[in-house]
Design a protein with these regions (language model features):
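Short, small/hydrophobic-biased targeting/export segments
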Residues: 13-105
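Single-pass transmembrane signal-anchor helices and their membrane-water interface zones
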Residues: 1-10
C-alpha cells in the first residue's frame, strides 16, 4: 500500500479586528472604508478583500462609512443576512444572542 500526500487546498487567511469590552475601535479597511466597531464587536475579512468584492463578516455592532466603488459591492454578512451597498454610511447591530439584526441608514 502506498500513501500519497496531497496538498490541502489553499485556505484564505482572514484579518480580524476586535473592540474589547468597554472600548470602541476605528479601522480603515484596504479600500478606505472607515469602520467604527462598538464594544465587543468583531470584524473579519479575508486577505483577498477588495480583489473582486468587498465582503466582511460582523459579530456585534459597527458603523460603516463605505468608500464608494460602483464596480465592487460592499457586503456585510452577519448571522443569516447580507447587507449590500456600493458606497454609503450605515450602522449594523447583530449580536449572536439577539433575535434580529438591526440596520440603520
Amino acid at each position: 500500500m502506498r500513501m500519497q500526500e496531497t496538498a490541502a487546498p489553499a485556505r484564505k487567511e482572514s484579518l480580524i479586528y476586535t473592540a474589547a469590552a468597554g472600548e470602541k475601535k476605528t479601522v480603515i479597511l484596504p479600500d478606505n472604508t472607515k469602520v467604527m466597531l462598538n464594544s465587543g464587536a468583531k470584524l473579519m475579512l479575508s486577505d483577498d478583500f477588495n480583489e473582486t468584492e468587498r465582503r466582511v463578516d460582523l459579530d456585534g455592532e459597527a458603523f460603516f462609512d463605505v468608500a464608494r466603488n460602483p464596480e465592487k459591492l460592499f457586503i456585510v454578512c452577519c448571522r443569516d443576512n447580507e447587507y449590500i451597498v456600493r458606497g454609503t454610511s450605515f450602522n449594523v447591530s447583530s449580536y449572536v444572542n439577539d433575535r434580529f439584526s438591526i440596520v440603520t441608514l
